[in-house]
Regions:
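Extreme N-terminal starter segment of soluble prokaryotic enzymes
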Residues: 1-3
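Alpha-helix-loop-beta-strand connector modules within alpha/beta enzyme cores
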Residues: 5, 57-80, 112-129
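Conserved anion-binding
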Residues: 14-15, 19-23, 97-162
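Short, acidic/polar
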Residues: 28-40, 84-91, 143-154
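Catalytic domains of carbohydrate-active enzymes, especially glycoside hydrolases
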Residues: 38-50, 95, 157-159
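Glycine-rich, proline-tolerant flexible connector loops at the mouths of alpha/beta enzymes
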Residues: 46-64, 104
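Conserved beta-strand positions in the central sheet of alpha/beta enzyme cores
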Residues: 48-51, 78, 101-102, 125
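Catalytic cores of alpha/beta
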Residues: 72-73, 77-99, 112
Length: 162
């Protein structure tokens, strides 16, 4: 089994949210790289990282932090949050990131997901957040009328594997 320890980031610091609620953000460590190295020492091969600032601002905010973890640890890094364009995906693909997770854009711009899968293959994953069975977007701040299973089936039909 592959365990994916996670580091969510707000203002460059590792945090945890309770049920995706930004009002519950609690800093859990002083340094992202130190946290990642702790996961290495515990035997992790992957780390799941989320740019929570990016998810709210709808753009890459903490991207250099992700790149630093990929460059300075042996971890495979999968990232999500604030990824809205092919240029964002290309940036990560060319800077050592092992997997790019598309979230809100999967619902709001499925054509971009389809293009990304064609260009980058299994580097692309789709993360679907759901509240009460329906897709939630923009860092859990917006709801939708789309059932999460329907979106998952649509993504699978486009060639998304993860």
């Amino acid at each position: 089994m592959i365990i994916f320890p996670a580091i969510d980031i707000i203002d460059g610091k590792p945090v945890r949210l309770f049920k995706g609620d930004f009002a519950t953000a609690e800093q859990v460590a002083d340094d992202v790289l130190e946290t990642a190295n702790g996961f290495v020492q515990a035997g992790a091969e992957w780390v799941h990282m989320v740019d929570l600032d990016g998810s709210l601002k709808k753009e890459r905010v903490n991207s250099q932090t992700f790149v630093d973890v990929a460059a300075q640890t042996p971890l495979k890094v999968e990232i999500g949050g604030g990824i809205r364009t092919m240029a964002d995906i290309d940036f990560y693909a060319n800077n050592g990131i092992s997997r790019v997770i598309l979230g809100s854009v999967a619902l709001k711009n499925p054509a971009l997901v389809e293009q990304a899968v064609k260009e980058f293959g299994e580097l692309i994953a789709v993360g679907i957040d759901a509240k009460n069975g329906f897709v939630a977007t923009e860092g859990w701040t917006e709801g939708s009328d789309t059932h999460y299973i329907d979106l998952a089936k649509q993504m699978e039909a486009m060639g998304v594997k993860t």
